[in-house]
Design a protein with these regions (language model features):
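Alpha-helical transmembrane bundles and membrane-interface segments of multipass inner-membrane proteins
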Residues: 1-169
Length: 169
């Protein structure tokens, strides 16, 4: 049904663009209203807003690298991942609805990351989750979209494994 697949594509596009918009809006708000390094306690002992700039990759890896190719390589890799995600979604190879929604969220998060690297040469992180003095790495909404998307893809894989002869939803 062409109408159904067009609607599905539109819905997945809205999910991706929604994740991208939420990510970029939140980063703009943090960059506009807080100084780099500033800390705001949101929930004592659990959640802070900390404005940081990460020129590296996940968990700050390669942030201290002086290699002039770091930025272009990260952008090139990100664009390749984005192209693969678009191809998977466009060709219907994402599995069922959970897998498609998951890949759409990952796509939105990846777009947010590559846009940051292209425009700012770094990624703005600001969410600091912790329990007492035990802090997780600071992250942003693009990271959240990618992690949530990956969880949905894994759930889709479990669903497919539990019902191998069932058509993807």
């Amino acid at each position: 049904m062409p109408g159904a697949s067009r609607f599905r594509g539109l819905a997945l596009g809205i999910i991706s663009l929604g994740a991208l918009a939420a990510d970029q809006f939140s980063k703009h708000a943090v960059e506009t209203h807080t100084a780099v390094g500033s800390l705001r306690v949101v929930i004592p002992g659990l959640l802070n807003l900390v404005h940081t700039s990460n020129p590296g990759v996940a968990f700050g890896l390669f942030a201290d690298s002086e290699n002039p190719w770091r930025g272009p390589l990260l952008i090139t890799f990100s664009v390749a991942v984005i192209a693969m995600l678009v191809w998977l979604l466009a060709t219907g190879r994402a599995g069922g609805r959970l897998g498609e929604c998951g890949l759409a969220l990952i796509l939105g998060g990846a777009l947010g990351k590559v846009l940051d690297r292209f425009l700012r040469h770094s990624v703005t992180d600001f969410i600091d989750c912790h329990i007492g003095d035990h802090h997780w790495y600071t992250f942003n909404l693009a990271d959240s979209a990618i992690v949530l998307g990956a969880a949905l893809v894994v759930l889709e894989l479990f669903r497919e494994q539990a019902h191998p002869n069932q058509e993807p939803a």
